[in-house]
Amino acid sequence: MFELTDEERELAAMVRDFAETVVAPQSYEADRTHTLSMDVVAQMGDLGLFGLPFPEEYGGQGGDYMALGIAIEALGRVDQSIAITLEAGVSLGAMPVFRFGTEEQKQEYLPDLLAGRALAGFGLTEPEAGSDAGATRTTARLDGDDWVIDGSKQFITNSGTPITRFVTVTAVTGNEGGRKQISTIIVPNGTPGFTVEAPYDKVGWNASDTHPLSFAGARVPAGNLLGEQGSGFRNFLSILDEGRIAIAALSTGAAEGCLEAAVDYAKSRTIFGSALSTRQNAQFTLCLLYTSPSPRDS
């Protein structure tokens, strides 16, 4: 039977306490006003959460994806907007630089990303394209020593916060044997021609920073290429695979939070003179949910 280590249990308890005492009290108002609390982000950085799966040489905690999943699950119990901010900050923001960046790029970006002093977005999804690389329309062409980028992206998390430093953009950089050559390029926020559009009015996760992006002749140095030219498709698929693990942890946490809320409601709701929790129908439903296998344990 799988069990957490003592260190992992301590991490879970620490993040759960942080979620209940710091995150939860501000969640309703943050969601209502569509505002990501930068104070909460800073405190997550102080706790080392953004650096969990990274080596200490870059400012990380020397942990792994299990540690990250534990933290995201604990946050997801009370606030999925905060949980996805951490997940995207790690999996989509810092991880591409760590996996595919040059040593110079790692030294430039990772210390601030892993400390929560900066965030980064991952510009993959487009109005008509996502993991289908063949449908990508954003282009980047070399002009002297610069990449010139044109196109648009949508639903890009952490792309417009006050501390967002850059977005990694997937773009068509050529053609190989009749197939689009996809590359990834670092585009700093504030680059002329790069616009972070107004945030979305979503049906949920409203405190998560999510924007469409547009590029109209945005020019960045050729050295901003992340990984080898043409390796973008392979690279972003590996990044998405890791991210899906973290999303599963977030979803598990959200389900646990919903179940706990349902139990609390059943105990407090009075019907025909007694608590709803005393009714067998409610008991059976809640017990079935409690005893069902968790995706985390599979």
Residue spans for each PLM region:
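A short core secondary-structure module
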Residues: 150-195
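Amphipathic, small/basic residue-rich leader segments at the start of a protein or domain
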Residues: 1-86, 107-108, 112-115, 119
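A structural signal for short hydrophobic beta-strand segments in well-ordered beta-sheet cores
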Residues: 138-141
